[in-house]
């Protein structure tokens, strides 16, 4: 997808964009970015690690790179979703359903929220558990069609996809820097929140 390549373009491209932005002047109306671009910018500002993939082969390759980078090749991956475990059955994962034995959590999400770069999740992903009960590191598999403008759109999407039984335990993950990494960034909004070291494997499906 050319849009995501544009987002992660060269430094010279970014400088050119910044100059054009300055030329607009401070009194010009702000340009409204597309929701996928807004999400990517906000997500990275929150400390998330973003890997855009055009197909499943790239997803598997990126996953293996994450495992190597963190020395997780021999570690256990917490996977609650059986369908997700089947999808990644050919990868180098060592799946478990034990919270105590796992080093990281592989999951999906409900939606990706463009306005604040957060991930919307529910009991479909985390059952009735609290985020603090999970490993510090998350690997989230999602698709570009899951990007929504705001939480309201995300909640409406959850309702429309689950007409028979609306999931519970709906929450967002927004802070993607572990507490020791954000000591210089303390503020009252992040107090008490559950921070996660989070990788997003984003598959193009539009």
Tell what function each PLM region has:
Residues 2-206:
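The feature marks the mature, well-folded catalytic cores of soluble enzymes
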């Amino acid at each position: 997808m050319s849009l995501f390549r544009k987002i992660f373009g060269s430094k010279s491209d970014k400088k050119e964009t910044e100059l054009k932005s300055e030329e607009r002047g401070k009194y010009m109306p702000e340009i409204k970015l597309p929701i996928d671009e807004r999400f990517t910018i906000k997500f990275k500002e929150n400390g998330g690690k973003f890997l855009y993939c055009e197909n499943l082969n790239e997803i598997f390759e990126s996953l293996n790179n994450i495992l190597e980078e963190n020395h997780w090749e021999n570690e256990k991956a917490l996977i609650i979703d059986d369908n997700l475990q089947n999808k990644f059955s050919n990868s180098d994962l060592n799946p478990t359903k034990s919270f105590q034995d796992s080093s990281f959590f592989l999951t999906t999400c409900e939606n990706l929220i463009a306005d604040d770069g957060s991930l919307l999740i529910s009991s479909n992903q985390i059952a009735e558990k609290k985020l603090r009960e999970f490993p510090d590191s998350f690997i989230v598999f999602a698709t570009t069609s899951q990007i929504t403008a705001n939480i309201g759109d995300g909640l409406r999407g959850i309702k429309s996809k689950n007409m028979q039984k609306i999931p519970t335990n709906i929450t967002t993950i927004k802070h993607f820097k572990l507490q020791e990494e954000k000591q210089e960034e303390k503020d009252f909004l992040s107090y008490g929140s559950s921070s996660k070291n989070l990788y997003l494997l984003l598959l193009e499906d539009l």
